[in-house]
């Protein structure tokens, strides 16, 4: 799922949090050879972490579809020309701040779009899905999905990444996503009985799954 999450001022705040000595060799967190070639930060400033956590919790779409319960903002990534990240599944143990908490979904938020290549892609049940994210746009995906970043051919790609826990399963979130989209379509005519019914069903499912 892709969603516009940060505005220009918020993007600037995130970029301002990148220090002079922030980045290290990204291979430190991925022990397998030839998996990635990028730079990865040693952490995220507290003010940036709080900003992103609040944005995740406040996003209506994310709340309706994923019902996040705990959000962890972990690190920045940077990709210059020639950098890439091959297909992989996230390695939680490489990040001590995760405290062995179980996470259900990952997110990657782009902080720049003045680059070429660098598309994020996922291996799903229906095939490979890829997209070049706009600045401020987030990709949200089940943590079990193998994912990667195509080689950057020009410019600098910067993003911030994290995970969150959820009260609903992947199958349930797919159903909630469909209900949300129906709601959005029918909300242009709030007198439509189907709209009211869809909202009630969605709220009921969230309540039942949260027990």
Regions found by a protein language model. Give the residues of each.
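Non-heme Fe(II)/2-oxoglutarate
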Residues: 1-70, 75, 175-211
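Catalytic core of non-heme Fe(II) oxygenases with the double-stranded beta-helix
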Residues: 61-177
């Amino acid at each position: 799922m892709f969603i516009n999450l940060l505005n220009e001022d918020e993007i600037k705040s995130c970029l301002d949090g990148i220090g002079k000595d922030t980045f290290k060799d990204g291979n430190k967190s991925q022990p397998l050879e030839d998996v990635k070639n990028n730079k990865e930060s040693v952490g995220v400033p507290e003010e940036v972490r709080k900003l992103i956590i609040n944005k995740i919790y406040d996003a209506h779409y994310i709340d309706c579809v994923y019902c996040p319960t705990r959000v962890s903002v972990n690190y920045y990534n940077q990709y210059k020309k020639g950098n890439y990240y091959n297909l992989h599944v996230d390695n939680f143990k490489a990040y001590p701040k995760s405290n062995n908490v179980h996470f259900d979904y990952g997110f990657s938020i782009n902080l720049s779009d003045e680059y070429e290549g660098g598309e994020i892609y996922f291996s799903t049940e229906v095939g490979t899905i890829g997209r070049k994210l706009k600045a401020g746009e987030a990709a949200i995906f089940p943590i079990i999905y193998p994912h990667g970043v195509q080689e950057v051919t020009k410019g600098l790609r910067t993003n911030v990444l994290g995970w969150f826990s959820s009260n609903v399963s992947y199958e349930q979130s797919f159903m909630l996503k469909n209900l949300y989209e129906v709601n959005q379509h029918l909300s242009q005519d709030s007198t439509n009985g189907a709209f009211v019914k869809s909202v009630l069903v969605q709220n009921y499912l969230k309540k039942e799954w949260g027990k």
